[in-house]
Amino acid sequence: SFIEHIEPYYFNILGYAGSDETVQSLLINFTKRCRENTGSKFQLVIYGKTKVNYPGVISIKNNVTDTGAEKGSLVYWLTGKEAACAINASCTNAIYDGEYTVNTNFKQYELEQAVSDGMFMFHNVSDSVSGNVLGDTRVLTDINTFTEVTKAMNKDFTLNQVIRVLDNAAIDIARLFNRIYLGKVQNDADGRISLWKDGIALFEEYQRVRAIQNFVDDDLPVPTQGEEKTAVLWTFEIQPTACMEKLYCTVVVA
């Protein structure tokens, strides 16, 4: 099957433009299993699926109006856009430059409700002052389907930029470990301090490109030995950065 063939490979985004609920459910379960059990950190982009409530799944509400086209054809564009998006960037407000005609016929309250429900939305943005009366089709906000916010997983986890940072951190740490330490460096204090120093360098680079903020060395403790002699345990904190989306102004009349 497709899933069996793709599972061994590294990729950032998986997309399915169809509306078959059986296939959608299969891919959602595959995404959850890979993210939580095998360490494969990718997101799934699908069309029209509601109440998914999972940071690893992005569901587009808008359909396309082109004759003969799959209603969920925006999945193709968004799959590429999300895959190409850097960890210090967001797809929010990105102009849709694809070949399909997007249905953006949503009222403001409908847009707000859709976002509240975890649906990825495109909307029309015009600027009559500049002469752009027709407007552009843009991404409203770069979110995933996660909606049931808790103390352990706050609203930050609804943002795809945050998920990108966390996923890439997991991938980069794993690659660092596999490339330099796996089967090569002893699991003693000196070996774990060496791993810690490389981790510090990695997250200093994350902070340099503004993917994370407020990082200090103390956020990354030295790894410890696990229950087995070959096991290394590492718990640390990072604070992903997010792009500006909302502006609140107070005008004081002098």
Tell where the protein language model's regions lie, with residue ranges.
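Structured, hydrophobic secondary-structure cores that serve as assembly/anchoring elements
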Residues: 82-254
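Extracellular Cys-Trp
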Residues: 1-101
